[in-house]
Each structure stands twice: as C-alpha cells, then as structure tokens.
C-alpha cells in the first residue's frame, strides 16, 4: 500500500504527528511519502495542490485545515486534531484568532464534505466534531509516541544546571494561551523559590514569561527534550484545550507524574489520582496545591510514573496508532 501524508506545516505537534505516522507506516512494510508544504499555504491552501503534484498513491492523508485542497480521485483520509471552534475555548480566543478561525471553519467543513474517512485523536474531539460540524462517522485513533525514545533513564548530559534542593517542574510546548502559558507565572508565584519551572518555546516563540523561578530553554532537540523530561520531578500542563496532548504522553512515557487541567482530551491520558492530578480550569490555587502534594511525596511520584509508563505502552504508541490508521485505509481500498 502507498500512502501520501500531505499537509501544510503547522509549526506544532501536528508536524510531529505527521512524521511519527509516516515512520509507523514504513515500519509496517508500506510505502509512505511525507510532504509538508510551507506554512504560508495555511491561509490559502489551494495553491499548495499545484505547487507539487501528489505522487500516485492508494491513500492521501491530511489534516482537517488543509485536506480539501488535496482532494482528487484517490481516497482521502482527514484527521481532526482539535476543534478550535469548541464553545468552551471561546472566552480565551482573541479577536484576530476568532476571525482566523472563521476562515478555518469553512476550510474544515469543505474537508469533511470531500473526505472518504475522518479520524480524531481523542474521544473528546470526536464528540466536538459531532456538536460543531454535525459529523457523526469519525474513527477514533489515539496519537502514538515513540516509547523507545521517550523512556525513563538517568541523564548524563546537562542541558541546564538545576539546584539539587528544588522541585523541578517542566512545561513542554508552544507558550500560548490555549496551552495555559499565561497561568504559569501565577502558579510559580504561588509555589515560591523552592520550585523551578523549565519551559520550552516549542516551534513558536509565544508568550514571554518573566519570573525568577521560570527558565526558558528555547527550542530543544529530541535528545535534549528526553533529558529534560527525565530531569524533572513533575510535568505541568494548565492547558485549556488539547486535541490529544503529545507532550503529556511523552512525559508519561518517561515515567513522570502529570498535573494537568481537567478538560478536553487530558482526562483520556491522565488518570486522576493514579497517573497524576487533574485540576479545575484556570484555578491557580488548585494547581499549586496538587503540585505541592506531589513534591512532598517521592514514593507517590514514582508510583504514578510507573503507572504512566505502563499506560503509554498499552494505549499510546506509534505502532498502535499505525494499526488504527491501517484499518481505516484498508476499509477504503477493499
């Protein structure tokens, strides 16, 4: 089977998803061509189709924002990563974002109309697809991560010097309001100088966090990222909307407990009380309380980390994701 994954470069976890999906398909003995178009086509996707002809394939797979632009006689699989039109997220969107998302809504609607199959990264997104777009036939395929790369180990390299007496938190991803980055300084102020938060800027610079106990590591390479996951004590994500939570799954795979928001897809990853704690959305005090509870109990952190590693290997690997997509592909070419 020949698969082409074609989409506009997103500068986010969507690009990681595309790369992991392509690698998984190849490992399963099929051909896969990965074609990421320039981000400029995000605003006008159609010219991306003519820029470079799609190789002859059995399946074309793309994300919902761009997929309609690549439709031809080949079966088209469309993946919805997260529904930005979710009413629960509306209070956090800026006026420019709302205008841009109106355009994206039209693009997504076209993609679903021409799709031969639609997949979602989590059950929450599948429900929102039904509510917002009236699309009721989506397949659930959880995103997979490389559990052999993201694994527990004792780092030998030192990307950043960390004082031994501090409890180290880690936030990975773009520093956006959707990810709850604006809450990080407030949470760290509550926690005080006994805690240190390491953040990455992801592939987009995002918000500037001015706080003495927050260190921005910038964009990290994969080996550095795995090191930081393993050097932290707790992974923190006060996100307001996730279609899956790639960095959460990576931290879990490295055997770390997670403190996350009880919203969108996050309860599908983090089992409250077993793999970490889920907090009320935007509740800085709740986040600080849960973090302090974990910081004071090393055995609990270890137990939750072991639970999370096992959970990832059972549910969120590249191979399991690949098997899900291959099932969808095979239904279309029988």
Locations of regions flagged by a protein language model:
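Conserved acidic donor-binding segment of nucleotide-sugar-dependent glycosyltransferases
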Residues: 219, 272-273, 277-284, 293-298
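Carbohydrate-associated surface elements
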Residues: 124, 144
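Short hydrophobic beta-strand element within catalytic cores of glycosyltransferases
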Residues: 257-260
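Membrane-proximal helix-turn-helix segments that form the acceptor-binding/catalytic region
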Residues: 98-118
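Aromatic "clamp/platform" in nucleotide-sugar-dependent glycosyltransferases that forms part
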Residues: 240
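A short, well-ordered alpha-helix in the C-terminal region of glycosyltransferases
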Residues: 286, 293, 300-315, 321-327
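Conserved donor-binding/catalytic core segment of Leloir-type glycosyltransferases
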Residues: 161-179, 185-189
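Short alpha-helical donor nucleotide-sugar binding micro-motif in glycosyltransferases
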Residues: 220, 227-232
